[in-house]
C-alpha cells in the first residue's frame, strides 16, 4: 500500500434492513495507526459499520477498501481483520495460552512459531505466568488483556473493538482505558472502536466520528468535537454545555454576533452561518465560563445571581440566573473551594468568542 493511502476506505456505504436505513451513504478514510472511535446512541449505525468492516454484514450499496484491496464481499476469514467482542468471547474450556494460540493455529503456523509468538505477545501484554489459567480464574482486566492478545497475535491490519469495556465497573474501566490506548500506541495498530460512552471516546481516541441516524454528524479530534461542536446533537451528546439561542446580528470573518436578550454576544463559526436576522444557537462549555466581581475585559460578559450549586468532588457546578434574560440560566464549573454563595450579590460571568461555538442547527 502507498504510504499516503488510507488503510481503510469506506466509499458511499449504505445498509438497509427492510425499510430501516442503518447507514446512509457513509464515506470515510482511516489512516494506518489511527485509533478511531465511532460514537453515538443505540441505532446510530456505529455497530453496523463495524460489522461491515469485519465482513459480518454486506452493504446494500458502496464498497470497503482495506489496504488497497476491495474486500466488500470477502468473508471475515479472508480479511486481515480481527475483533474484540464486548463479552471477550474467550473459550472457557481453554487455558489462556490455548485461547491466544487459537488464531495462530487456524493460520497453519508451526508449533515453534506459535510458541515464539505466544511468548512475545504474553510478555508484551504482561500476561507472563497466566498461560495455564482458565478465563474463569482471571479478573476483568486480565480477561481484557487475553482477548486483546488473542486478537493481536495473528498481526491483523485492523482491529475492531465492539464496546469491549461495557462489562467493567467504573474504576476498572478507567484503568483499562489507559492500558488499551497504551497498547495501541506501542503496537502502532489501527483500532476501530465502537462505543456509546463519551468518556471512553474522549479518553482514548485520536479521532472521533459522531454518528446519528446512520450519518456522520461530525468527524474530528476529541478536542475539536468537545470545544467546537458543529451541531446541537454533538454539543449535547458529548459532555455538558450551555446552549444560547438568539438572532444573528452580523459576521466578521469566522466571528458571528448574536443578540441574546438584548445583549450582543460573539462566537466562533468556521463552518458558516445563516443570514442576518435568522435565529442561531451557540454552545459554551461549562469550564469556559469564569466569575468576576466586576465586568471582565472579555468579548462576552453577563451579570447574574447564583441560584444553585452541585458538589462534584474536585469541582462544583454553579447555576446562575442571568439578569434581564427572562429566567435564562448559565451553568459553570468552578473549583470546589470557590467561595460562591447561593443568593449572594450579583456576579459577572465572562467568556471569550472562541469559547462559544455557533452551531449549524
Segments (PLM) and residue ranges:
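Non-catalytic connector elements of ABC transporters
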Residues: 241, 250-361
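Helix-to-loop junction immediately C-terminal to a conserved catalytic motif
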Residues: 54
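The feature captures the beta-strand-to-loop junction immediately N-terminal to the Walker
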Residues: 39-41
Amino acid at each position: 500500500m502507498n504510504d499516503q493511502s488510507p488503510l481503510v476506505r469506506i466509499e458511499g456505504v449504505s445498509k438497509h434492513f427492510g425499510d430501516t436505513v442503518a447507514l446512509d451513504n457513509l464515506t470515510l478514510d482511516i489512516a494506518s495507526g489511527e485509533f478511531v472511535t465511532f460514537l453515538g446512541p443505540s441505532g446510530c449505525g456505529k455497530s453496523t459499520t463495524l460489522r461491515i468492516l469485519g465482513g459480518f454484514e454486506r452493504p446494500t450499496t458502496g464498497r470497503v477498501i482495506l489496504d488497497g484491496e476491495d474486500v466488500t464481499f470477502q468473508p471475515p476469514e479472508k480479511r486481515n481483520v480481527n475483533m474484540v467482542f464486548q463479552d471477550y468471547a474467550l473459550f472457557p474450556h481453554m487455558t489462556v495460552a490455548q485461547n491466544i494460540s487459537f488464531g495462530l493455529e487456524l493460520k497453519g503456523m508451526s508449533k515453534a512459531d506459535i510458541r515464539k509468538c505466544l511468548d512475545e505477545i504474553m510478555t508484551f501484554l504482561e500476561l507472563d505466568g497466566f498461560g495455564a489459567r482458565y478465563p474463569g480464574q482471571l479478573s476483568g482486566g486480565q480477561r481484557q488483556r487475553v482477548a486483546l492478545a488473542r486478537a493481536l497475535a495473528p498481526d491483523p491490519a485492523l482491529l475492531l473493538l465492539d464496546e469491549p469495556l461495557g462489562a467493567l465497573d467504573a474504576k476498572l474501566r478507567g484503568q483499562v482505558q489507559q492500558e488499551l490506548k497504551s497498547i495501541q500506541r506501542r503496537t502502532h495498530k489501527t483500532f476501530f472502536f465502537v462505543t456509546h460512552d463519551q468518556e471512553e471516546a474522549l479518553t482514548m481516541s485520536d479521532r472521533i466520528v459522531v454518528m446519528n441516524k446512520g450519518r456522520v454528524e461530525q468527524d474530528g479530534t476529541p478536542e475539536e468535537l468537545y470545544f467546537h461542536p458543529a451541531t446541537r446533537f454533538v454539543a449535547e451528546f458529548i459532555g455538558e454545555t450551555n446552549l444560547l439561542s438568539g438572532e444573528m446580528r452580523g459576521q466578521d470573518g469566522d466571528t458571528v454576533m448574536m443578540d441574546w436578550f438584548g445583549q450582543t454576544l460573539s462566537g466562533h463559526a468556521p463552518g458558516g452561518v445563516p443570514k442576518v436576522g435568522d435565529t442561531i444557537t451557540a454552545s459554551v462549555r461549562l469550564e469556559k465560563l469564569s466569575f468576576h466581581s466586576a465586568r471582565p475585559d472579555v468579548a462576552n460578559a453577563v451579570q447574574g445571581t447564583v441560584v444553585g450549586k452541585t458538589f462534584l468532588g474536585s469541582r462544583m457546578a454553579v447555576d446562575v440566573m442571568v439578569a434581564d434574560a427572562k429566567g435564562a440560566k448559565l451553568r459553570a464549573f468552578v473549583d470546589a473551594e470557590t467561595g460562591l454563595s447561593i443568593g449572594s450579590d450579583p456576579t459577572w460571568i465572562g467568556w471569550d468568542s472562541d469559547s462559544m461555538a455557533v452551531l449549524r442547527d
